[in-house]
């Protein structure tokens, strides 16, 4: 998605060898008009897949996932990172390691929101080592639902997340794919959509 790549180049900050800070439009402050376009692009890419639910993980995946769900006219579910006292039964859980935060969290979704009839589109803000997506896949599979695709706003293609997901048989759709950071500059490779 050319507009997203341009925004990353303009407002993204490279931190070290493998971190991209995009807090001015995605991971802290949200540019809703860009998120709306992102939602429309993902929706167009999966319009014939029979998707019934959009699933993400809190927190930065929520904004793009809401707009994807809106564009598809479907519910969006987000996995919670903290146990909530109102979530008391039928909880689906998985362990997820955060590359950026360097911590492992138990994420959960109430089982009543997913079932074996569902066809799921996973949406997340970043794909690095694939652990967030892997955790969501575990939860979705616990419900007996089918994963149709994993939609990623920004993929760090120089890390092994895509390979992990594709080797497991999942379709990955990334809007912006970063080949690497060279001397503090962002280098893109061809995106999926």
Swiss-Prot record:
Q: In which pathway does it act?
A: Purine metabolism; XMP biosynthesis via salvage pathway; XMP from xanthine: step 1/1
Q: Top enzyme class of this protein?
A: transferase
This protein's source sits in the domain of life called: Bacteria
EC number in record: 2.4.2.22
Q: Name one GO molecular function term.
A: xanthine phosphoribosyltransferase activity
In UniProt terms, what function does this protein have? Answer: Converts the preformed base xanthine, a product of nucleic acid breakdown, to xanthosine 5'-monophosphate (XMP), so it can be reused for RNA or DNA synthesis.
Q: Whom does it interact with, and what assembly results?
A: Homodimer.
* Record's protein name: Xanthine phosphoribosyltransferase
